[in-house]
Every structure is written in structure tokens, then in C-alpha cells.
Design a protein with these regions (language model features):
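Ligand-binding clefts of soluble mixed alpha/beta catalytic domains
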Residues: 1-162
Length: 162
């Protein structure tokens, strides 16, 4: 399974909740976890929150996760994060130039938390790759994982969330 991930997140709202986004998302996550084939994820641009998890990350059992240098991987985007971090909110509110303080806070957040090198250092991404090498890196990964053998016990199955 090859995942090319660019997910800005789930669109929150009652329409999605009533439509069963959690239930349907759980079916997809269950399928990832039960799959015994090689699973490779390439994060192209954005990977935020629950939507990032839904694109087969390391915690879901991806064999290899690669990211482009421009990828942004975090719980949420920088502009949203600075709006909810209480110390930053106070600083912006009390500033003479709120726009400049907010822009500096966004830049600081992106540098500290929202880049693939930080995430790779924490072990959530295996490698940060150049976009031009993506095809060759995927081919190499598939070659490396061609002998992967993962089997589930006979007559054992999980409890799929229907």
C-alpha cells in the first residue's frame, strides 16, 4: 500500500458527525492495521491531526514513512495553534502591533514544531527526502519490503467497527 499524504485535517462540523465520519474513518484505520502487505507513506505537504493518522503513519504500522522537506506535520497548522496557545494569545492581545507578534509566533511555531526534521528526530518519520528522488526511494522501499511476511493467526480476526 502506498500513501501520498497531503491532508490539512478533518473539517469539523455536525454534518460530518451525523454522517458518521468517526465510524467510517474507523473502518479505514482497521483495514490499515489488518493489512499484511508493505505499507509506505510519503508526506508531500500537510499532515495535520487525525487526518494525518488516517493516512497510515508509524503508529498504525507503516513500514516506512518519508517526508518532503517542505512537509508540515503537527497536531494543527501554525496559524490555528497560535490562536489557542494562551501565552501567545495574551502576548498578541497586549502587543502594540498584534499582526507582527502573531506573524512572529507563527514563524516560531513552524520552526519549533511544524517541520519534518523535528518529527523525524522524534522517530515518526524515517527519512526526509528530496521531491526529485521520491520515485526512486519508493522503488527502493518496495524492493526492500518485497520479502516482508506478516501473517495473522489462522481463524483469528479482529472486530471491525461497522
Amino acid at each position: 500500500m502506498l500513501f501520498r499524504s497531503d491532508v490539512p485535517g478533518f473539517l469539523p462540523g455536525t454534518g460530518q458527525e451525523y454522517g458518521g465520519i468517526i465510524r467510517h474513518g474507523a473502518k479505514m484505520l482497521y483495514a490499515y492495521c489488518e493489512a499484511t502487505v508493505p505499507k509506505i507513506t510519503v508526506i508531500l505537504r500537510n499532515a495535520y491531526g487525525g487526518a494525518y493518522i488516517g493516512m497510515c503513519n508509524k503508529e498504525l504500522g507503516a513500514d516506512l514513512v518519508m517526508a518532503w522537506p517542505t512537509a508540515q506535520i503537527a497536531v494543527m497548522g501554525a496559524s490555528g495553534a497560535v490562536n489557542i496557545i494562551s501565552s501567545v494569545k495574551k502576548e498578541i492581545k497586549n502587543a502594540e502591533d498584534p499582526d507582527a507578534v502573531r506573524a512572529a509566533a507563527i514563524e516560531d511555531y513552524e520552526e519549533k514544531f511544524n517541520n519534518p526534521y523535528v518529527v523525524a528526530g522524534l522517530g515518526y518519520v524515517d527519512d526526509v527526502i528530496e521531491p526529485a528522488t521520491t520515485r526512486q526511494r519508493i522503488i527502493s522501499a518496495l524492493d526492500m519490503l518485497s520479502t516482508k511476511r506478516e501473517s495473522l493467526p489462522a481463524k483469528k480476526h479482529g472486530n471491525i467497527p461497522l
